[in-house]
């Protein structure tokens, strides 16, 4: 995004602004010197592996003492972007010092969320700045949370057959079976802001599917609001890839950059032939 105000940003700036105007339920969001920040009570068990979390929940009196593991926290970043959008051109040490000065009051934890770790979708400058920030942040009392593993496919092949030829026999067979099922879908790229997203019924259906995905998730951190999802659907600032079969929808936000194809599916849902499936 060459015109972006923020480093590390794969998405349009409009998505950052939308997050600030309509933060997740129970969150408070603001822009501090062009740094998106949000505050919420953070449960230290949130990111534990499910097996470990299950063992902890079986400990005696867990329901009583577990509340002691929740702390007021202020985060630099958003829950709507792949990586933390940081102000361009600001030295990491100065950024962290400013964050502490403006946001530390009343907070038990200061967290920089979704710091990229040598991302193939970012330029060298953004990656180098992120590495410097990750090195110095702990010494300044910050917690650094790396971004989740990014799913992407380098576009270094000329055909589907060439791509499949690189895979194992079982993987090729599985993907060919899935590709055949694609024939039952009518696939169309529908820009957000399209008239179809002006229908409240469509937006309510998609939001209901999102809530179903949220309910099935093992990790509950941010619950996107109806306003956020409706405004996103009616925005023409970025696009979605939407598969439609009859009255069924499958939607994801999508982008491509640096010779790679990446699809962000946070907060998105799929419904195909009457069944609901989560994608994360």
Residue ranges of predicted features:
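N-acyltransferase acceptor-side catalytic subdomain
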Residues: 1-280
């Amino acid at each position: 995004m060459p015109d972006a105000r923020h480093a590390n940003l794969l998405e349009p700036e409009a998505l950052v602004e939308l997050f600030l105007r309509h933060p997740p339920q129970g969150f408070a969001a603001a822009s501090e010197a062009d740094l998106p920040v949000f505050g919420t009570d953070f449960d230290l068990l949130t990111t534990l592996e499910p097996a470990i979390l299950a063992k902890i929940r079986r400990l005696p009196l867990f329901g009583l003492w577990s509340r002691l593991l929740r702390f007021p926290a202020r985060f630099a970043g958003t829950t709507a972007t792949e990586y933390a959008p940081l102000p361009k051109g600001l030295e990491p040490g100065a950024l962290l010092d400013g964050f502490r000065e403006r946001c530390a009051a009343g907070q038990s934890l200061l967290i920089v969320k979704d710091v990229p770790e040598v991302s193939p979708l970012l330029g060298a400058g953004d990656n180098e700045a992120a590495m410097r920030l990750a090195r110095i942040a702990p010494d300044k009392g910050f917690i650094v949370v790396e971004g989740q593993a990014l799913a992407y496919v380098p576009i270094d092949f000329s055909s589907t057959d060439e791509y499949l030829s690189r895979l194992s026999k079982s993987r090729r067979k599985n993907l060919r079976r899935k590709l055949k099922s694609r024939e039952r879908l009518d696939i169309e790229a529908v820009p957000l802001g399209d008239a179809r997203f002006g229908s409240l019924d469509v937006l309510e259906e998609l939001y209901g599917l999102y809530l179903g995905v949220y309910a099935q998730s093992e990790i509950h951190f941010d619950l996107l609001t109806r306003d956020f999802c409706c405004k996103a659907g009616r925005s023409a600032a970025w696009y979605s890839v939407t598969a439609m079969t009859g009255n069924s929808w499958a939607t994801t936000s999508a982008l491509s950059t640096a010779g790679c194809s990446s699809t962000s599916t946070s907060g998105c849902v799929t419904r195909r032939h009457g069944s609901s499936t989560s994608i994360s």
